[in-house]
């Protein structure tokens, strides 16, 4: 019966987070999503010495359960994959909570008239990301994992995403060093502009009107920032957050992942544009969070 799955006297899945559910069956046992991330980390994120850094953002009420499972399983996977895991945890910050809405999309209030707050979405974890001591960070949903028979594709594409990121970041850093030196020609600035437009997909219509000094300010602003490369999959059902060219407040056009909540669904043209999207991002990102000076 379904109650045997979610009730306390059964598997208690109704009270457990997705990361702790029994997820994939193997000949030698069953793995949770958390364990699958241990395996993935060993396959594509191990350093030269075999060290694998994995960070989980979890809810306060479930943290002890995650820590207990890691303590029970980490030795097993270290022995199996020749890895040395460094597992850390953080919790979504209450300061990122957002106002809950009712069925009419109006702020929800409790019986005392106080606004009810709820945890924000994935974007609220950006502070947790920024707190990490790392150069490159792979970001995934806890349950966005596949069984071993499908992991080869996962590993290949993770390496591809990271390779694209490192290649773009290396070039951006070289250009920033050039701009810092003060020794550059207008032709070199045009080369940097082409990189920003063609590789980073960021455009500005009035660039030809800018003097070189203003061009440098603009280029430095676009290059000296965190960088991310996002994996996309084809839409086969309801469209999710996908890649769009967005108009920014500073007059530039850049590639962004837009969710349905960011689209004016009352505008037929914009709604149709969103619904015709061919790809979406299943929270599969690789991010570079240090600047060109290592900060």
Region locations from a protein language model:
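Extended, domain-scale alpha-helical bundle/helix-rich regions
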Residues: 30-33, 42-46, 62, 107-179
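Short helix/loop capping segments that flank catalytic or ligand/cofactor-binding pockets
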Residues: 65-67, 97-99, 127-128, 137-140, ...
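Short, small-residue-biased leader/transition segments that mark boundaries at the very start
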Residues: 2-6
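Short, conserved secondary-structure transition motifs
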Residues: 58-65, 89-102
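Beta-sheet entry/capping signal
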Residues: 51-56, 84-88, 114, 134-138, ...
């Amino acid at each position: 019966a379904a109650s045997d799955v979610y009730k306390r006297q059964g598997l208690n899945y109704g009270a457990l987070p997705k990361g702790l559910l029994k997820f994939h069956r193997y000949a030698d046992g069953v793995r949770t999503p958390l364990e699958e991330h241990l395996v993935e980390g060993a396959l594509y994120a191990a350093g030269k010495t075999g060290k694998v850094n994995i960070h989980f953002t979890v809810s306060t009420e479930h943290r002890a359960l995650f820590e207990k499972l890691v303590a029970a399983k980490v030795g097993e996977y270290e022995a199996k994959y020749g890895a040395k895991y460094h597992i850390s945890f953080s919790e979504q910050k209450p300061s990122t909570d957002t106002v809950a809405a009712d069925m009419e999309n109006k702020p929800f209030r409790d019986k005392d008239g106080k606004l009810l707050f709820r945890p924000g979405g994935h974007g609220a974890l950006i502070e947790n990301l920024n707190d990490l001591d790392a150069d490159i960070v792979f970001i995934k949903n806890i349950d966005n994992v596949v069984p071993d028979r499908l992991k080869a594709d996962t590993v290949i594409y993770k390496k591809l995403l990271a390779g694209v990121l490192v290649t773009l970041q290396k070039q951006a850093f070289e250009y920033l060093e050039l701009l810092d030196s003060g020794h550059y020609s207008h032709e070199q600035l045009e080369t940097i502009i082409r990189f920003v437009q063609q590789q980073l997909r960021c455009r500005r219509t009035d660039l030809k009107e800018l003097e070189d000094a203003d061009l440098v300010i603009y280029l430095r602003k676009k290059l000296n920032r965190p960088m991310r490369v996002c994996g996309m999959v084809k839409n086969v059902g309801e469209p999710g957050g996908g890649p769009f060219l967005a108009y920014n407040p500073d007059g530039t056009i850049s590639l962004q992942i837009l969710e349905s909540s960011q689209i004016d669904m009352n505008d037929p043209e914009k709604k149709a544009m969103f619904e015709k999207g061919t790809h979406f991002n299943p929270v599969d990102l690789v991010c570079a969070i240090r600047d060109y000076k290592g900060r």
